Amino acid sequence: MSDDPSTNDALGTLRAAIKQAVTDVRGQTPLAQSFTNFVTINLVANAQLAAGGTAAMSYLPDDVIATAEIAGSNYINVGTLLPFFKNALPEIARKLHENGKTWVLDPVAAGIGETRTAILESFRDVPPTIVRGNASEIIALDAMWGLADADSTTPATRPAGVEAVDEVDAAVDAAKRLARHLAKRSPVGAGAVAVSGAVDLVTDGERTFRLPGGSAMMTKITGAGCSLGGVTATYLAVAEPLVAALAASLLYDRASEIAEVKSDGPGSFQVALLDALWNVTADQVAASDIIETN
């Protein structure tokens, strides 16, 4: 925290923007299209609806490109891959970039497998507007894109599937580099990276925030991170990248805390999470703990 009045004013302005984003999503029901993995597609769509948005799910490149023309934003998740995705996803990313469309990337299991690596490497020059992942995925993507000097890159300890083996603190520099890279090529002139963990981190490359809270039960259901990526895309349809990433992460922190109290285990937690996403107020989200760091 800072006692600097200018810092406090800036944080107050940010809170107001977060509140407005939550309000706008529920008032406008924006469409965020998802090309997401097979395991979690149902939860992603339901979470987008519960947050107040509209969902569209597709795997056909021509469908995705056509729907992007009417969608407010888009979401690509590389969690489960088929052979044709190796050509389809780079083409989709190129078209989104050429057409000035915003999108969110979840680089699930970055660093594992030649196909996934080739796809993620292809996004470097036509990148998303927001990247959301765990610490290991963020570190791996930063390394894939060659954004760090060789002597300053901190590689992930080992590939870990969809689970992080690195702490959020280890991904701070990688997240900042990625965010600055996204901003340089973004159709809206800005980008953001959200790193999920015990204490989430969100950065636009210039300002960095830590978000305490949330529930450890999020690690006991499949698709929590994937659905957060989808909801981040929902917010990106109405807000600039930093605000969208913060609003989605904070919404999930508050909703997961409520869901944990109301559930008896993973099954009821998932149901309670959807209910909480629906019921958490804009004021509750905006009033969450937000710690600005260097």
UniProtKB/Swiss-Prot annotation:
Positions in coiled-coil regions: none
Co-factor requirement: Mg(2+)
Plastid recorded as keyword: no
GO MF: ATP binding; hydroxyethylthiazole kinase activity; magnesium ion binding
Keyword Magnesium appears in the UniProt entry: yes
Metabolic or biological pathway, per its Swiss-Prot or TrEMBL entry: Cofactor biosynthesis; thiamine diphosphate biosynthesis; 4-methyl-5-(2-phosphoethyl)-thiazole from 5-(2-hydroxyethyl)-4-methylthiazole: step 1/1
Annotated positions binding substrate: 57, 223
Reactions the enzyme catalyzes: 5-(2-hydroxyethyl)-4-methylthiazole + ATP = 4-methyl-5-(2-phosphooxyethyl)-thiazole + ADP + H(+)
Pfam families: HK
Protein name: Hydroxyethylthiazole kinase
Species per Swiss-Prot/TrEMBL record: Bifidobacterium adolescentis (strain ATCC 15703 / DSM 20083 / NCTC 11814 / E194a)
Lineage: Bacteria, Bacillati, Actinomycetota, Actinomycetes, Bifidobacteriales
Gene name for this UniProt entry: thiM
